[in-house]
Structures are given as C-alpha cells and as structure tokens.
Amino acid sequence: MFKIIKKSIEWGGRTLSLETGKIARQAHGSVVVNYGDTSVLVTVVSKKKEENVDFLPLNVQFIAKSYAMGKIPGGFFKREGKPSDRETLISRVIDRSIRPLFPEGFHDEISVVCNLLTYDTVNPPEVPALIGAVAALAISGVPFHFTIAGVMVGCDENNNYILNPSVQEMKASSLDLFLSGDENSILMVESEVKELSEENVFNAIKFGHEHLKPVIKLIKEFADTIGNKPESFAPIDASDITQELEKYGKDFEKAYSQTVKQERVQALEAIRENILNTLKETGKDEKLITYAVKNFERSLVREIIRKKSVRIDGRKHDEIRQIEVEVDILSKTHGSALFTRGNTQALVVTALGTTQDEQIVDDIEGDRREHFMLHYNFPSFAVGETSAARAPGRREIGHGKLAWKAIHPVLPDKSEFPYTIRVVSEILESDGSSSMATVCGTSLALMDTGVPIKAPVAGIAMGLIKDKDEYVILSDILGDEDYLGDMDFKVAGTSEGVTALQMDMKISGISFEIVEKSLEQAKAGRLHILEKMNAVISEHSDDVKDHAPRMLSFYIDKDKISAAIGSKGKNIRSVCERSNAKIEIGDDGKVSVFATSGTEAEIAKSMMIDSITELEQGSIVDVKVVRIEKSIVELEFLNGRKGKMHISEVANEHIDSIESVLKQDDTFKALVIDFEKGGCPKLSRRRVDQETGEFFEGELYNEERKDGPNDRDNYYNNSFSRKPGGSHHKRPPRPRSGFSNRNRPKFGNNDSSSGFY
C-alpha cells in the first residue's frame, strides 16, 4: 500500500532522515523530517492562479500543536488558537529562505505547511522544518531549481562554534545564529549576538555554511530517487513594451532624484499612469504593462547607482541620512525618545511594571516569563496610505522581535533592575529601515527611563546592487532601494560588537566576500549613528522618573515566607493596602516592593519586616479594633493575628465604657504586656505615647480611680485556678501603677522599630 522512500545521514552527532510515501500522500509534496527525536511533517500544494498577479502568493505556516510536547492546551476550549509568536517567526524564516528561489514571474499559489509532530525539547524545530520545506518543494514538481539547507550555530564560553546546539547549549551560548544557503552562497541570516566582533560573526557564518553541504547533498539524492522533475516555466516576455519605455527614462530618473519621499511617489505615479493610459490605447495588456514598467524602473535605478555612484536621494554609497534625536518628549511617560533618520521616524515609549506584569509565554519549550517586551506598530499613515486598524501582522511581529534581539544582550540582570520593561515603537514615518530606527529609539528611551543598559545600541540596514560579478553595497537604504535592490541586511550593535543580524535576499545568494564587506561597512555606519545618539544621551539616567514606580528589595528568612504572606495572603494584602504599594515575595526570600514614591516603598518595607518579627513583652505594635465587648477589646495585627485589651488599659484615666474612647476599625499603637496560656497577646494602649510611639514610664493611673468588678486587677489576674464546684481563688492584686516584674517591658530595647505590624 505504501511506497516509502527514506534517506538519512549522521549530522552534528544526530541522525537526520527524510521520508515520503506514507502519510499526506495527496499533497503535491510530502516529507517527514526527523532530527534526533524531533519530527516535522512538511507538505506542499500548488495551484494555478486564475487571475494575473504581480507577486508570488507563497504562504508558509509552521504549526506546533501541544500534543507534540505531550501537553493539553490551556484555556476553556482546550484547543490551539491563533499562531504563537514563535510559530510566526519560524514561518517567516522559512518563507524568507525559499521565496527568492522561485523563478521571476512565477505567480502560482504555493502553500507550505510544516506540522511539528514530536518535539524532544532538545533539538529545535527550525532546522528540520526548513530542510523539510526544501525537500517537499524539490519533489512537488513546482519550478524550484535551487537546493538549499538551514543550520543553527552557537558559540560556547571558549569561543568554539557549536553545530545545531541543543536547547540547553543555546541558553549558555553567546551566539544564536540561523542561516540558510546553497553550496556556494548565503541566502538568509537571523541572529542574536552577545556583542561579538564582526570577525567572529563572519567566521560563525562560514562555519555554518560549511556544514550545510552534506544536507544539500542528501536533499538532492532524495529528490533524484523520487524522480519528480520540476515543471517547465517560461518567463513573461515583455520586451516589446520595454523598448517603448526607453523614452521615459529621463522622466523616471528625474522623479527618482526627488529626496522627499512624498514628492518622489507623486512624480512616479504620474509617470506610470501616463504610460499605462498611452500603451493601453495601443491594445497592450494592463498586467503586462505594469510588469514591464516595474522591471524597467528596477533596471534603470540599479544602473544609475552602479555606474554613476549616485543614489536615489543623491547620497554616496556609504552615506547616512540626516539624523535627529530627542529624548523625554512625553512628560508623563516613564521614558520616551523620538528618532528620525531621513523620512523614517520612530516614537519609542517605555513603561515600567512589577513581576506581576511579566508576559507569560506558552512556548514549545514550556511556559516561561518575559520581563522585557518590545512591541512594534506600523500604522498605514506612516507611508501615506489609508487602511483600517488591525492586529499586528507577521511583519510587525518579526520587526519587533528583531529589535528585541538587538536590545536584549545589553539589558541589566533582573537582580540589578527587577522592573518589568515594556517598550512600544510607533512608526510615524517610513522610508526604509524602520526596524533599525526602532532599535535606536529603544536604546535612547531606555536610557531616558533610567534602565542601566550596558551600552547604547544602534542599527543600520545595508543594501546591494549586483550585476554578475560587479556589485555596490549601500548603507542606510531607502524603501525604494530595498524594493529595487538585491539585499536587505540589517545589522545592530554597540560600539564594541554586534547584537543582532537579519539578512534577506532577492537573488539566489551572495558570496562570503559581500557578507564580509557588508559587515565592515555596517560597522562604520553604526558608529556614526551612535555618535549622533551619544551627543544627546550617552548614559542612562541616575534614577527612574519621579512618576515612575519606585522599587526596593530585601531578603527575609525562608522560614518567614509563610508568615509574610499570611493565611490566604491576608498579611501581604494588608500591608499592600495600608502602604499603597505592591509587594512580591520570591521562593528565595527576596521581597520586592513597588510604590509610587520612595517614602511609600520604605513604609511598606518597614511594615513587612515588622509583620514577621516575633512578638515579645515590650514590643510596640500597630493594631486595629475588630470587636468591642463590655470590658474587652479584640484587636488585630496587620498579619491577621488577634490580641486582647482590657478596658483598664485603654486610657490613663477612668472611663465608663470602651466606646467613649475607641470605635470599630480604629488603629493605634499598643504595648505587648503579657501572653495568655494559649499565646494570645495582652495589649495596652495607655502605656504608649500615641504621638511618639514610646513607652510611658512611672505613674500612669489616677490614684483616685474607682475600682470595680471589671477593674484591671481582675483583668491581669484572669488566669484563675478553678476548684471543684466552680469556686475561684484570686491571685494577689498587682500594684495600681507601673508594671509588675512579670509584666515589665524590656525598656532597654524599646525602639518602636522592633514592633510587629
């Protein structure tokens, strides 16, 4: 029934296998990739496009369902919802790797679906998913004429490169690099780097590329065994229209020389509309005209840049656009910056929060918490277009993650700066390189906020114009240069090294020479941008803003954690309510206090420390009235513990009733004078100066006060010895003033700070 074909090799100390012919047989291409114990099913289906379009409708989906990790989804419905950010990012990596390999003019609809079948939590699925996508395309019959592969590279503490590092190895790695390419060139790069030099990054790329070759050979052998040849594809022939476009060359050249984007766009649209109307009258097809005009513009601009050494806006190849930097532009935010580079502008705003504000991420490696979030927004008005507001798409998620990778290596340890940090980048104008403007703006905003980042970070996008063996590398590309060029190579980092890379190609790869020169030219541009940024702010503010939350932390004994939290959280809740602060207690005994002011934070700290201090005679505590009886007041400490006070200890003068002095929910300071046999504290209000919190010493009572059946002697001697028959023997009366030796506080240690809240 099944005609199974399987090929495998040993690669990076694990077995990599490709298999087809057993499952998903109705797809045009179906491959199961196993690497270690991670397994991915990749299917490819193509469909002829009924309408002419001028783009490749390629849809790549990576799907990781929870059963692959042996889990049941959370939530009410118990099934997967929208794709996670991790799934979206893996889908983008695969898309960016394979999209340049389809022939120009091929516009059939292609669907590539990568289903994660099993995940061993050791071997990340990115590599087998990309390998499976290439293998499935190779046997599907679509015109896909290049064979590539993907690889991950890490770097250990001894600067040794690691091929396809495990999840645990990657956690300790100073490099997280994913690249794809064929036998001779590099096609796509995605990386987070901990300030490594350009030389180290370049060597890592060469290391990874060398280990691609066995996999490329495996895919070719696998496809040859299947024997499905790619269908023939004839490119669109628009040569007759192209000849008629030559007379518009000067008009296009003049329009592209406009440095202001809006003026350039308007001039180009006017020329295109004129051409379309003119050629349609001759009977030419509108879609064919549009296709020819697009290619004509591309060839014209590329030739001008390559031969005349002048770019669209008149800059030199390595020249950076004008930069304007402002910080603290939004008065009531925790931090803000406005970064403008040419016609690209990013408003970046920060907000600080507590551990409770951390993002809970349901990742394929398991749930984790992120204390640093970076969200990138790209509204339609940024490019002068109209569009309804929508949820963030793949592009926004990808650009935000790239900026996150660029900033993450320079963030302080959480022990040094325990705030949760959210950064939002609002792109207000865009003419290329908005993700790198986000990187620059984020670095500025974090320093304005007072986040002690290790060094400022800047980013730059590099472009490429290549014709056979001739090429020109462009620094800080415009949107049109990205659209008409061959490469978009984003490099971010500090003055000491690289922190993030992202390279996308529109051609079938570039040489190592171009990669190396691009990194060198990017460094020069990055240092120039950092110089402009440092002229405005080069170090983080000494403290967070006055209106930002204040934080302090301290440690308590682990055996005190339960008391600090209290029964059902009563103690910590009470301290938070009374101090107007947020308090978080870790398993290691670390207590983090967040408040709107430093004073409130210190009050909360004092309350929390006092609430777990052991009660003893002589302690002064804060209490609240919870119940009043005829001669007894029931009091409550902040931690929920109860105590009692006799009417005789309410005031230093005779009172007829407790209600004449106290009422429900009153709070005051009281002295612990004794404990009942059951441990219930006996308290006194009259023995504490309510203004200073100090003990009263000496004569406290009016000698003429009237004793009655509920006098203080009865209270202090209410530990009766009961005889059979119910009679009681009363203890000898205590002195009418001062303390008995048994109840005398330890006045040598009567500092109110030793109290119990």
UniProtKB/Swiss-Prot annotation:
Ligand binding (Mg(2+)): D482, D488
Predominant subcellular localization, coarse grouping: cytoplasm
The KH domain, residue ranges: 549-608
GO MF annotations in UniProt: 3'-5'-RNA exonuclease activity; magnesium ion binding; polyribonucleotide nucleotidyltransferase activity; RNA binding
Compartments where located: Cytoplasm
Record-level GO BP terms: mRNA catabolic process; RNA processing
CDD domains for this protein: KH-I_PNPase, RNase_PH_PNPase_1, RNase_PH_PNPase_2
Chain residue ranges for the region called Disordered: 703-757
Gene Ontology CC terms, in alphabetical order: cytosol
SUPFAM superfamilies recorded: Eukaryotic type KH-domain (KH-domain type I) (SSF54791), Nucleic acid-binding proteins (SSF50249), Ribonuclease PH domain 2-like (SSF55666), Ribosomal protein S5 domain 2-like (SSF54211)
Record-listed E.C. numbers: 2.7.7.8
Bias type Basic residues, positions: 725-734
Domain S1 motif: 618-686
Keywords attached to this entry: Cytoplasm, Magnesium, Metal-binding, Nucleotidyltransferase, RNA-binding, Transferase
PROSITE patterns documented for this protein: KH_TYPE_1 (PS50084), S1 (PS50126)
Keyword Transport: no
Catalytic class of the enzyme: transferase
Cofactor: Mg(2+)
Family matches, as PANTHER family: POLYRIBONUCLEOTIDE NUCLEOTIDYLTRANSFERASE (PTHR11252), POLYRIBONUCLEOTIDE NUCLEOTIDYLTRANSFERASE 1, MITOCHONDRIAL (PTHR11252:SF0)
Role this protein plays: Involved in mRNA degradation. Catalyzes the phosphorolysis of single-stranded polyribonucleotides processively in the 3'- to 5'-direction.
Family the UniProt entry places it in: Belongs to the polyribonucleotide nucleotidyltransferase family.
The protein's name in its UniProt record: Polyribonucleotide nucleotidyltransferase
Lineage, uppermost ranks: Bacteria, Pseudomonadati, Pseudomonadota, Alphaproteobacteria, Rickettsiales
